[in-house]
């Protein structure tokens, strides 16, 4: 083994170790904070403990989301912050509806308000914690919006489309994981409230959140993807005009389409990613049946 290879392997190993240690530290700190805030409340059932663990786990997911997309965020916010921040603000408002709606229609959802069940310390902690999560999710959605604007403003190039494809895939997957984790936490919140015997938090709420998050993902993802397909088609047609190409060019055309992600496999992966919140909600409801 050469010294360069050993150094590369050693560096990768240290990065992996530091990443695991960082994730563990974030989880431990959040778990201790949530546990401390929950002292003396009616949130002490096993279901509530699982819910508190999921809350801490979400913090790790959010930190990972920022780390994975940090380079793109810095680049975009320096060069063209308007579309990203504008879209992110709209997504924050949209996601905030999941926090506001239960309070507006509290009589239909709760016998007692959540803060009365959780206590002020835990309730306030969860409120601000979730708000941070909304901002992280919104920034990732803003990166997708920037990709959409970039496709509209610039003439398609191979390098540009490959970069856009990677961003769309990474951001969509990241946003899906964030929303599915939120669905899981909501499901265990519902079970915690039932265990406390203090409210009527219907399981249908979990399903409605899954449906809402799926619709939001589609609204964020579809316009950018449609423009990506349009730009990729334009580039392929410009390089291999349909009326002129022979068998060899047809194979090259197909290879280029595959490289750009215009395949059935990519379409299936995108469908799974965008539908993951509703799939997660259905699974949570099914697993939660007595």
For the regions a language model picked out, list residue spans one by one.
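Internal, hydrophobic cores of structured domains that mediate oligomerization or house catalytic pockets
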Residues: 62-179
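Membrane-helix interface motif
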Residues: 29-42, 97-116, 145-152, 181-197, ...
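An N-terminal, globular interaction/scaffold subdomain
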Residues: 5-105
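Hydrophobic alpha-helical transmembrane segments and immediately flanking/interface helices
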Residues: 113-125, 190-210, 273-290
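A contiguous, surface-oriented mixed alpha/beta subdomain in the mid-to-C-terminal portion of proteins
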Residues: 165-233
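Loop-to-transmembrane boundary segments
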Residues: 6-25, 79-95, 158-181, 251-279
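Alpha-helical transmembrane segments
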Residues: 44-60, 119-141, 203-221
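Alpha-helical oligomerization segments
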Residues: 226-290
